[in-house]
Amino acid sequence: MAVSAVHLESDAFLVCMNHALSTEKEEVMGLCIGEVDTNRIVHIHSVIILRRSDKRKDRVEISPEQLSSAATEAERLAEMTGRPMRVVGWYHSHPHITVWPSHVDVRTQAMYQMMDQGFVGLIFSCFIEDKNTKTGRVLYTCFQSVQAQKGSEYERIEIPIHVVPHEAIGKVCLESAVELPRILCQEEQDTYRKIHSLTHLDPITKIHNGSVFTKNLCSQMSAVSGPLLQWLEDRLEQNRQSVIELQLEKERLTQELATM
């Protein structure tokens, strides 16, 4: 039986968006951590950004090792929060293409639902342009797979998704956001080392590959690390200002209490 709805907390939504917008050449993916209530509503509290072992323009996959690591992280969060946290879904990006899941996505989702009927899939379609306004858009959807009435194939069923606002970003989501630049850097290093280890490459090709590697790292610093650092600094300044305002409010209330 399909879930009735998905409630995605805004700080987890922020991490998903940052991850999806980190690259427009290949798809990215991650896992959703949360819980399912008695009304079959999936509550997503945080996400885990996965490291891609194979970069493809139109496909991403989850390895068993990554699922195991995510399950361990969910257990840690359950102990930390005292709530029944577990892996409740996965998300991936669709750069430059439609938000609707492909046949591969639907089959992959069906495979996960064999292990957990409450498992959901999220897709973030980015780097697309509205033809009328000529402005960029980001679309997102949530889906599950159901057996088609005719044949052995699966078809998607759209699940209502609601973004639940939060005044502040949670610790776990903040850690995931900070982890993103490191994971992207590791992916670039893995790709470079794999190519650089080939013995038949001539010196000019190796120099070219090194230049491409450096260029990609600089692009990541400009597009991901720089804006993330600026956002964290702005958030820190906002928190400091809030502390000052709360201290002034405390002093005012203390003075009023003393005059009573």
UniProtKB/Swiss-Prot annotation:
Its EC number is 3.4.19.-. Binds 1 zinc ion per subunit. GO terms for molecular function: cysteine-type deubiquitinase activity; metal ion binding; metal-dependent deubiquitinase activity; metallopeptidase activity; polyubiquitin modification-dependent protein binding. Pfam families: BRCC36_C, JAB. The keyword Nucleus applies. It is found in: Nucleus; Cytoplasm; Cytoplasm, Cytoskeleton, Spindle pole. SUPFAM superfamilies: JAB1/MPN domain. It comes from the Eukaryota. Its cofactor is Zn(2+). A motif (JAMM motif) lies at residues 92-105. Residues 6-149 form the MPN domain. One of its GO terms (cellular component) is spindle pole. Zn(2+) binds at H92, H94, D105. GO terms for biological process: cell division; DNA repair-dependent chromatin remodeling; double-strand break repair; mitotic G2 DNA damage checkpoint signaling; positive regulation of DNA repair; positive regulation of NLRP3 inflammasome complex assembly; protein K63-linked deubiquitination; proteolysis. Keywords: Cell cycle, Cell division, Chromatin regulator, Cytoplasm, Cytoskeleton, DNA damage, DNA repair, Hydrolase, Metal-binding, Metalloprotease, Mitosis, Nucleus, Protease, Ubl conjugation pathway, Zinc. CDD domains: MPN_BRCC36. The keyword Nucleus applies. Gene3D superfamilies: Cytidine Deaminase, domain 2 (3.40.140.10). Component of the BRCA1-A complex, at least composed of brca1, bard1, uimc1/rap80, abraxas1, brcc3/brcc36, babam2 and babam1/nba1. In the BRCA1-A complex, interacts directly with abraxas1 and babam2. Component of the BRISC complex, at least composed of abraxas2, brcc3/brcc36, babam2 and babam1/nba1. Within the complex, interacts directly with abraxas2. Both the BRCA1-A complex and the BRISC complex bind polyubiquitin. Metalloprotease that specifically cleaves 'Lys-63'-linked polyubiquitin chains. Does not have activity toward 'Lys-48'-linked polyubiquitin chains. Component of the BRCA1-A complex, a complex that specifically recognizes 'Lys-63'-linked ubiquitinated histones H2A and H2AX at DNA lesions sites, leading to target the brca1-bard1 heterodimer to sites of DNA damage at double-strand breaks (DSBs). In the BRCA1-A complex, it specifically removes 'Lys-63'-linked ubiquitin on histones H2A and H2AX, antagonizing the rnf8-dependent ubiquitination at double-strand breaks (DSBs). PANTHER family: EUKARYOTIC TRANSLATION INITIATION FACTOR 3 -RELATED (PTHR10410). Belongs to the peptidase M67A family. BRCC36 subfamily. This is Lys-63-specific deubiquitinase BRCC36. The gene is brcc3.
